[in-house]
Amino acid sequence: MIYLDNAATTRQKPQPVIDAVVSAMTTLGNSARGTHEGSLSASRMIYGTREKLATFFNCPRPDHAVFTANSTEALNMAICGLLDPGDHVIATDLEHNSVLRPLYRLEAERSVSLSFVPADRQGRIDYGEFGRLIRPETRAIICTHASNLTGNAVDIGRVGAIAHAHGLIFLVDASQT
């Protein structure tokens, strides 16, 4: 079969993923809901996964690995949790609504100021523009890894280095990749 209706997360799952989900649904209980084996097994699995994620992302605390229902919820949580009144954020013209909507809401409700690195007609950005847009109140750079609008990939290593060099938070929407 050739599957042509693929969004960021809809591709049909391979059998090992299906097997793992079925196993979890039929053998585990609700985490932290009791002292029975199903609940304890679920808690151990969740904490073990947090430990693996913390190691993978070089995060010093496994309890900082947070699970959400989807990437929109995760992006909203991160964006709304990180930004304070008066902060400045740099994003690109390539962002998905799951980034733009919370940014515009914070612009209206918390006086967060926004700057956007423009994309040309081919969806390419000038990486030097990130540095030119940084101000004393800049708190974060938020960008997509690959645009759902153009399909263009952003060199997040390059953008991350700019953010790191200026002590900024770097938040990547990698939903499309």
Language model regions located:
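Pyridoxal 5′-phosphate
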Residues: 1-177
